[in-house]
Swiss-Prot record:
Residues 392-406 have a biased composition (Low complexity). GO terms for molecular function: ATP binding; ATP hydrolysis activity; ATP-dependent chromatin remodeler activity; DNA binding; histone binding. One of its GO terms (cellular component) is Ino80 complex. ATP binds at residues 984-991. Residues 7-19, 495-507 have a biased composition (Basic residues). The gene is INO80. Residues 189-201, 508-517, 640-651 have a biased composition (Basic and acidic residues). It comes from Cryptococcus neoformans var. neoformans serotype D (strain JEC21 / ATCC MYA-565). Residues 1-148, 189-250, 391-430, 478-534, 546-676, 1768-1788, 1828-1853 are annotated as: Disordered. This is Chromatin-remodeling ATPase INO80.
Length: 1853
């Protein structure tokens, strides 16, 4: 791609041959923009520069003659000045603000829309006074022919000199103009010159405004200069010079001749060709009058003030001026458009049109239908061609437009050949001195240059003007040789030069070959000069914008069809295609569009070719295939992030521009020319849309967006200023008023002091004493009066309040008495109504007979005369029901009628459901054995007609007797349309009974569904397996999984109007509670025959969304399966009863008032007042709807269940932590918190209480739940090198010691190389041997010295002879390391022992023992078989605490590697490494590597190196007491067992069970405790499984299957809630509760996983309980909760039931309780009332002193709602596959919740006796201590917040 400077250099040669053209002649060519000017560096760019593009020179400009330039020596307004111009050179040097000028004088390419007049830095051109008059072409040529001929070389030199003179004159004029402007600037800055014009010039200007304006005095409209000025003038609008449509006054231009200074044209040169063309057109049409152009001049000069350019950030003051400026610009655009449309431009004879390339000529002719479209053939011609060949290849068509070519063809018959100035007669050729345009040379000069091959300065039109004459000369010469005959055609006409102007294309290639490539010339737009210039500029812009190198040329275009046929749009196009599609150059030539239809429209308008018929120009696709950038061969480069953002932004802007263009031309762009507005036919979408038309890097749309952003910021800033103006004004106004008031007060004070000071002092002296006494008396009197009346009013208020209070208490007591009687009658009525309903329903469905089994006691029903109740006839009017009356008979009659209505409603509901099923086409059910109509309330004796059900035949199992009775009871429920609760104890087969009921309905009643089974997530697979096992004819559809899977399943069962038979796709739908709530809207669309809820305690909370969602499902009957209908309170029972019978049990308050209060309070055994009559009535109400059997009554073959409590004492560490927690708990705070634990209390109190309980339970489980004993290591003062990838090392990894001390010691290298370094003795030691003297004289370990000294008497080496060693061995031994010496000594002893003689056996005959030695006579103290004393001492030492590593040696706080000296010598470093890492020592100490232990070759080699050393090394083979202590202390695993008393007891218990062959279920409450148990089981190597709330459903099923089938698994760890519901684990015979649940039902369900139907062994249940801790008391409270259901559904009536207020007793010992009771009695004797806590007040909480994180949360210990939510989370298994695929982990303990609304407890009734005693005693202690007054509720002293600091052993410090 050619750069900008190259384009300037190419343009330079044309500037020597052309001058600036007159503005008058160029007025009709101001059609489009060029790249904008560079901004001034000294000032900020104004907003208009962002919104509007800068001016551009117009296209197709013909320079004026040189003489004109001499008269007007100003540079052209449309072209930059010459290369010697300082402004031009500056623009070239600064690439940021430069752009390439046009390379030729004909066309200036651009891809901009049409400009506005304000874009130019000069005033709009004006028209001359009269249209210029010129000679006709023929007369003009004749005048030229008459002149004498001039030599071509002389004429050429003369023109050169004229042009040089014109250039110098122009420069002088510019210098004068610059000085004049500068003087005006200085004059304008002087005072009084505000109204003067500002003729400042823009620096680096390539377009001096003097060319356009000429020497005019009015130079006010200029741009701001670098220096800046206070005022700037607004630019003129075109409306001042040109007419608009709104103009009412049109004046000819002659009236304004004096106001317009237009220089006359030169006389010695011909007029420009454009004017010749206009004159010729006017001459052809004499009828058309020549109307002078009209102008409307508005002389208005306004100035706007602007700030100094140095005020950065104050451009907001330009806003109004810019808005007005922009509006003027829009008006100017419209004015220019209208003016251009009014100009009729015609090309005359001989006038050159825009140059066309071969491709464009072919396109035009194709439209006109003259020639066909030729195929593109790429043929390379030789670069060396003769000029004759090129001239012979020139086009025969004349230059100009297709119309001109057509006229030339018409004139062929007249033997005319079109030249530059009109038709030329071959017989009379033009004069050689005729001027050829646009070059300005004579014909002789042009012919001479063409013949010489020098085409510099010539254009295609110049060559075409003379090519015919040159061809005729050549043919004439040939004809002279051939006989003087010119070549003629068949019709006799002279043959013209054949073919298009190919020769000129080749000639032009001489100066083009450096600019373009062959591939570029073949593109669609490379045929014209404009296209080539635009392409190169676009490519330069793209390269600059994308920061890329030269853009790829010749990129192909991939076109796609648009909506309209024949329309094509490039998918990926480069700058050439973009220019071709959006080229606006020719669209503005109105005359050529109107007459010739030759080129495309401008931006925003449709192509002129689109207006022609499709038949004349059929669309043709391009043959080239375009690939996306980076696709295909070559390397693909991913665009960077800025490029991606730029592409997205460009695409958005392109779409925005296309939409705007479809709507019509905007204010910035306009279409010039008459005719209708054209619409855009193609929407171009580029892969890359960089800025290709603006060197500044800002496109028009981007500039608009920036302008909008700047406007938004300015508006925001101004809005803030406007918003703050009133406030600041108020502040200023207030300040002003305050200052005025202060000044006024000061003035008044001054006046008083000035005029009245003397008089005031005199009066004060006279009456000072009197006034003082009177004031004191007055004050005393007023005070006494106020005290008297205040006391009087207080006494009156007290008396009045006392009387009102007494009256209120009396009225309240009377109202309470009346309300009590009323509620009693109301409850009696409701109970009577419910009893009547239950009595007859119970007789009907035989609940009594179903419960009556062998060994089970059943009460005899007392006849209360219900059969004899006389209700009267139906419809008998009864008195209104009034609970205030004492008419019991009326209440009984209303109750009987209500019961009858309830029975009738249930019967009608069941019948309506059956009718709806029949109406949908379902088969009729079989005949019922008993009709519902027979249930007549008047005759209750209907038991003999009840249904007796046998086992269904399709059931593939044998039901037991009690199960068959349960099936009969369920069948009778269905017959009556009644819902029920099957509450058999866990393990009695509730599932098989419900399955048999479905089989009974399908077999006997032909009801095949749909049935809905909702169960916990852990039991879904169990339901599916049992249905497929027992009733294979019933098709079960499992409905769970991901949302997509469920959507697929819904297509099966949610179809409307489907009938159910045996062949239906499904009969039973199985899903979970969670999915039933989520897909409630889909389940409500079905009408279910039966809905079965397994583990129905999941809906025991009536306030939960689950309870409400399931209650809204449409079903005929509901069946609840639960083993624990009552878990905590009567509220749960009411929730289940309301779910099955909402008509009867509709009020929970009434039910709780009658039953809950008395039963729950009486279970405490202290204040119980439950009457037997109430209990019997409750049983009578529940029995018809609930069937419950227990195992001991109905299951004889089931093994026994034994429960054993294992009480353990806390370990030392646990006791210390428990004691520390206990000391930081204030009993007083606990009591106050328990009293305040009401619905309106502070919820933080409850949370703190729950948190405290969790901390104590953690201590009881394991102290590591607080803080694990971490690995302890000292601080290492050193560095380590980073290891590589260990996966690549394989089995044998090389891990050298890389520890390096941070301290480095540098030693001189001379110490190592030249001696002087100390070293340890050794074979290779250099100590003392660096020199000859040290080696021989001073070294005593040499063999020579040792041998010499052995010969001397009393020598130091005399021992050598005694030991039998040679001097050489002694020297080598001395120099060897100690380890080598030991190994050699051991080897000698081994050989001596194995190979030596027996010298130590005194009884051996051949003994060589010395005779003088005496054998040992020490007696042996141990008998054979006894343990030696040495072994005993070793065992005791090993078992002692002191033998542990952490006890033997205190760990260092910091360690550091040795400091290694460093010298710059490689041999020194190697020697150091050999000393530190000796292979022999390393192998001896650590032995072989683990991978080499079993390698015989390695073992043999090791034995040779280190004989008598085991293969594992000396350190592993040595005792622990002999090995060094490791600095890394790892807690032993045994400590995990010893620190917890429960875990230590569990360890011993598991050993016993493992030895006995038992299998264990281990239940936990905390998941963190399960993690610790997993470590223990791994340590003991027990096989185990783990199931908690995070286990997915599929894994749960697999784990249960593995447990049941694999006897090798010893332990199954489960959480109580996740593993205690609905799964069968009968393979286990032992259940261990590590920590028990607060809810006894949860533990009961968990243990029944093993003790259930199918268990043949005896089940043993162990409970690990910490003695004397909170766990022991919690277990007592939990067992007391179990007695509630025994009271309700059993026979037990009295038990200890815990209250939330009795939580305090969990933290108190028996002695503390007894002491509290004694103190409470003393307090009651003194009339003390226990204080309460203000709910909203912030008090110090008892838990504040315990800054501990529970980590587990509450398990619902004190809250039923929390327990319900916890159960819901566990039973759903939050790791289920349906949604999260294992995401989320449900802990065994649920989150902390707060009391359920509705459970109101008063202080007196809510607190137990022990808690009340403790509260009174604590309060009395404070009274006696004097801290508070009696009868006052004061808060206890705040407790200090203390953190428990744990030591390294885990104990509190």
């Amino acid at each position: 791609m050619a750069d900008h400077h190259d384009s300037r250099r190419r343009y330079s040669h044309t500037r020597h041959h052309s001058a600036s053209k007159s503005p008058v002649a160029l007025m009709d060519r101001i059609v489009e923009r060029s790249p904008p000017l560079h901004p001034q560096p000294s000032s900020r760019m104004s907003l208009s520069a962002l919104v509007n593009d800068s001016p551009s020179p117009p296209r197709r400009i013909t320079p004026p003659p040189a003489a004109y330039a001499e008269r007007h020596p100003h540079p052209s307004a449309y072209y930059p000045s010459s290369t010697t111009d300082p402004g031009y050179m500056g623009a070239m040097d600064d690439r940021r603000y430069s752009y390439p000028p046009p390379r030729t004088s004909y066309v200036q390419p651009s891809t901009h829309p049409s400009p506005t007049a304000s874009d130019y830095r000069y005033r709009s051109p004006v028209l001359p006074q009269h249209p210029p008059t010129h000679h006709s072409p023929s007369s003009y040529s004749a005048s030229l022919y008459g002149q004498p001929k001039e030599d071509p070389a002389i004429a050429y030199a003369r023109m050169r000199e004229e042009m040089r003179t014109a250039e110098e004159a122009r420069r002088e004029a510019e210098a004068l103009e610059y000085r004049r402007k500068r003087d005006m600037e200085f004059a304008a800055r002087r005072p009084g010159s505000e109204l003067m014009d500002d003729p400042r010039r823009i620096p680096h200007s390539s377009f001096p405004r003097s060319q356009m304006y000429g020497p005019s005095a009015d130079q006010s409209r200029v741009m701001p200069s670098r220096n800046g000025k206070d005022y700037i003038s607004e630019p003129p609008s075109p409306s001042e010079l040109y007419p608009t449509d709104e103009d009412t006054e049109r004046l000819p231009i002659d009236r304004y001749r004096r106001d317009i200074d237009v220089p006359p044209l030169p006389r010695q040169l011909p007029p420009p060709p454009s004017e010749i063309g206009r004159m010729a057109d006017r001459a052809r049409s004499p009828s058309a009058p020549i109307a002078p152009p009209l102008l409307k001049v508005v002389r208005k000069r306004t100035k706007v003030i602007r700030p100094n350019d140095f005020l950065v950030g104050n451009e907001d003051v330009w806003e109004d001026g810019l808005i007005r400026y922009q509006s003027k610009r829009e008006d100017e655009v419209r004015a220019i458009a209208q003016w251009a449309a009014s100009c009729q431009v015609r090309n005359g004879v001989g006038e050159p049109s825009l140059p066309q390339t071969q491709d464009e000529s072919i396109k035009v002719r194709k439209i006109n239908g003259d020639i066909a479209t030729p195929t593109n053939k790429k043929k390379r011609k030789s670069r060396k061609l003769n000029l004759d060949d090129e001239l012979l290849g020139l086009a025969s068509s004349p230059p100009g437009s297709p119309n001109a070519a057509a006229e030339a063809e018409k004139s062929e018959s007249k033997h005319h050949i079109y030249g530059m100035n009109g038709p030329i007669d071959p017989a009379n050729p033009p004069s050689p001195s005729t001027i050829v345009y646009p070059s300005g040379l004579t014909r002789a000069e042009v012919i001479a240059k063409c013949e010489a091959g020098d085409v510099e300065g010539l254009t295609e039109d110049d060559v075409k003007a003379v090519q015919d004459e040159m061809w005729m000369r050549e043919k004439a010469a040939q004809a002279a040789e051939n006989g003087g005959v010119l070549p003629t055609n068949k019709d006799g006409t002279v043959r013209r030069k054949p073919g298009p102007a190919k020769g000129w294309r080749k000639i032009r290639g001489i100066d083009k070959k450096k600019e373009t490539t062959p591939g570029k010339a073949q593109s669609t737009t490379a045929g014209s000069v404009a296209g080539s210039v635009a392409d190169e500029e676009a490519e330069a812009d793209i390269a600059a914008l994308l920061d890329d190198s030269i853009a790829k040329k010749g990129k192909k275009v991939k076109r796609r069809k648009l909506e309209e046929p024949g329309a094509e749009s490039p998918r990926f196009a480069d700058a050439e295609d973009e220019y071709n599609e959006h080229r606006p150059s020719d669209s503005v030539l109105l005359d050529e569009i109107e007459d010739e239809h030759s080129r495309a429209g401008s931006v925003g308008e449709s192509n002129a070719l689109d207006t022609l018929p499709a038949a004349s120009a059929p669309p043709k696709k391009k043959n080239s295939k375009t690939k996306e950038p980076g696709v295909g061969k070559g390397r693909w480069t991913r665009p960077t992030k800025p490029e991606k953002e730029l592409v997205k932004k460009a695409e958005a802007l392109a779409s925005r521009t296309s939409k705007a263009s479809l709507a019509g031309p905007s204010d910035d762009t306009f279409g010039v020319g008459p005719g209708p507005a054209e619409e855009v036919q193609e929407e171009i979408k580029h892969e890359y849309a960089p800025n290709t038309h603006d060197p500044r890097g800002v496109s028009e749309n981007e500039a608009k967006i920036r302008h909008e952003l700047v406007e938004d910021l300015q508006k925001q800033a101004w809005s803030n200023i406007v918003r703050d103006v009133p406030r600041i004004y108020r502040v200023f106004q207030g300040y002003d008023q305050s200052m005025k008031q202060i000044a006024q007060r000061r003035a008044q004070a001054c006046v008083r002091n000035a005029f009245g000071q003397r008089n005031q002092k005199t009066m004060q002296r006279q009456s000072g004493k009197v006034n003082k006494e009177g004031a004191a008396k007055a004050k005393r009197i007023v005070k006494e009066l106020a005290a008297f009346w205040r006391k009087n009013e207080k006494d009156e208020v007290i008396a009045r309040k006392k009387a009102e209070r007494e009256a209120l208490e009396r009225a309240k007591a009377e109202e309470e008495a009346r309300e009590t009687k009323r509620q009693s009658r109301k409850l009696n009525f409701l109970l009577t109504q419910t009893e009547l309903y239950s009595h007859f329903i119970g007789k009907k469905i035989k609940t009594k007979e179903a419960e009556a089994a062998e060994g089970m006691d059943v009460e005899e029903e007392e006849k209360r005369g219900m059969e004899e109740i006389a209700i009267g006839e139906d419809g008998e009017p009864l008195p209104d029901l009034d609970y205030d009356e004492d008419d019991e008979e009326n209440l009984r009659k209303h109750a009987a009628r209500g019961a009858q209505a309830a029975i009738q409603a249930a019967r009608d509901k069941a019948r309506a459901f059956d009718d709806s099923i029949v109406g949908r086409g379902a088969p009729l059910p079989g005949d019922d054995t008993m009709d519902g109509d027979e249930l007549n309330f008047q005759n209750p004796s209907l038991g003999e007609n009840s249904v007796t059900i046998t086992q269904p035949k399709m059931l593939m199992a044998q039901l037991k007797e009690y199960q068959l009775k349960g099936l009969t009871w369920l069948g009778n429920l269905y017959e009556q349309g009644i819902n029920g609760i099957l509450a058999d104890e866990m393990g009695l087969g509730k599932t098989i009974q419900s399955i048999s009921l479905l089989a009974y309905l399908a077999e006997h009643h032909n009801l095949w569904g749909p049935f809905l089974v909702i169960a916990p997530a852990s039991t879904l697979h169990n339901w599916q397996q049992e249905l497929a096992r027992f009733v294979p004819r019933l098709k079960a559809l499992p409905y769970w999984g991901s949302p997509k899977d469920r959507e697929t399943l819904r297509k099966i069962w949610s179809r409307k109007n489907q009938t159910f038979s045996e062949d239906s796709p499904f009969h039973i739908l199985i899903t979970s509670y969670q999915l039933a709530v989520q897909d409630e809207k889909y389940l409500q669309g079905m009408k279910w025959q039966y809905m079965i809820l397994d583990e129905a305690q999941a809906i025991k909370s009536s306030s939960s969304a689950r309870w409400k969602s399931l209650l809204s499902l449409h079903c005929r009957n509901r069946l609840l399966l639960t083993g624990t209908p009552i878990q905590n309170s009567m509220h749960e029972l009411w929730a289940l009863l309301h779910f099955i019978m909402p008509q009867l049990f509709d009020s929970h308050e009434e039910f709780a008032e009658w039953f809950s209060k008395d039963i729950e309070s009486s279970s405490g055994g202290v204040t119980g007042n439950l009457k037997p009559e109430q209990l019997k009535r409750l049983h009578m109400i529940l029995k018809p709807f609930m069937l419950r059997r227990v195992k001991k009554h109905v299951q004889k073959e089931l093994g026994d269940k034994i429960e054993i409590d294992l009480l353990v004492d806390l370990s030392q560490r646990q006791r210390e932590i428990y004691k520390a927690l206990r000391q930081r708990v204030s009993i007083t705070d606990l009591l106050a918190t328990a009293e305040n634990n009401t619905d309106n209390g502070n919820p933080k109190n409850m949370r703190s209480l729950v948190n405290l309980v969790m901390q104590f339970r953690k201590v009881c489980n394991h102290p590591d739940l607080f803080e694990r004993a971490d690995v302890v290591s000292p601080f290492v003062f050193g560095e380590f090198s980073q290891s590589g990838n260990l996966a690549r090392e394989g089995d044998g990894m090389y891990l050298p010691d890389s520890a390096r001390n941070a301290i480095e010691v540098q030693i001189p290298r001379i110490l190592w190389t030249d001696g002087g370094k100390l070293d340890i003795p050794g074979e290779q030691s250099l100590a003392g041997s660096d020199t000859k003297i040290l080696q021989n004289l001073l070294n005593i370990w040499t063999p020579e010295w040792i041998n010499e000294r052995t010969k001397c008497a009393d020598a130091e080496f005399g021992f050598v002879k005694l030991v039998g060693s040679s001097p050489g061995e002694t020297s080598r031994s001395a120099k060897s390391p100690v380890l080598v010496q030991l190994l050699e000594g051991a080897e000698k002893e081994r050989r001596w022992t194995e190979e030596g003689r027996f010298v130590d056996d005194s009884e051996f005959a051949a003994s060589v023992k010395k005779g003088f030695r005496v054998p040992s006579v020490i007696p042996v103290l141990t008998q054979p078989g006894q343990v030696s004393l040495r072994e005993i001492s070793r065992r005791v030492w090993d078992e002692s605490y002191l033998s542990r590593d952490d006890a033997r040696c205190i760990g260092d706080y910091a360690i550091a590697p040795i400091v290694k000296p460093i010298a710059s010598n490689r041999s020194f470093l190697n020697a150091q490494d050999r000393i530190l890492n000796q292979p022999l020592a390393h192998s001896t100490l650590y032995g072989l590597a683990p991978s080499e232990l079993h390698d015989p070759l390695a073992a043999e080699q090791f034995s040779r190196i280190a004989p008598s050393v085991p293969l594992t090394g000396l350190i592993p083979s040595s005792a622990s007491s002999q090995t060094p202590v490791s600095p890394l202390h790892i807690p032993p695993t045994k400590r995990l067992i010893v620190d917890s008393a429960k875990l230590a007891r569990l360890d011993s218990l598991l050993r016993e069970l493992k030895a006995g062959g038992h299998r264990v279920l281990l239940y936990f409450q905390m998941t963190k405790m399960m993690d610790l148990i997993e470590e223990y089981l791994i340590f003991r190597q027990y096989k185990y499984l783990r199931l908690d709330g995070s286990s997915p459903i599929a894994e749960r099923r697999d784990m249960v299957t593995s447990w049941q089938t694999n006897p090798d698994i010893f332990v199954f760890c489960l959480s109580t809630r996740a593993g205690g519901l609905g799964i069968n684990l009968t393979a286990a015979d032992t259940v261990i509760f590590y920590d028990h649940d607060w809810n006894p039902s949860s533990d009961a369900q968990a243990m029944d996983r093993a003790h259930r139907v199918g268990q043949t062994k005896q089940v043993t249940v162990y409970r690990l309980v910490a003695r004397g801790t909170i766990e022991e008391r919690i277990l007592q409270m939990a067992r007391g909760k179990k007695d509630i259901q025994d009271v309700v559904v059993g026979t037990k009536s009295v038990s200890d039931v815990a209250k939330p207020s009795e939580i305090v007793s969990l933290f108190m010992d028996d002695e503390e309780l007894a002491e509290s009771v004694a103190k409470r009695k003393q307090a009651e004797a003194h009339g003390y009332i226990a204080p309460t806590i203000i709910p909203n007040g912030r008090r110090s909480q008892f838990g504040d002193g315990l800054v501990l994180d529970d980590g587990e949360g509450d398990d619902g210990f004190f809250n039923a709602a929390a327990a319900a939510r916890a159960n819901a989370e566990e039973e759903e298994g939050l790791g289920a596959e349906e949604e999260s695929k294992g995401k989320g982990k449900a802990k065994a303990a649920a989150a902390v919740t707060f009391p359920v609304p509705g459970e109101k407890r008063s202080h007196k009734k809510g607190m137990g006796k022990k808690a009340q005693a403790a509260a009174a005693a604590a309060a009395l202690e404070r009274v006696i201590a004097g801290n508070e007054e009696p009868l006052a509720a004061s808060k206890p002293p705040a407790k200090k917040k203390v953190k428990i600091a744990l030591g390294p052993d885990g104990l509190p410090l």
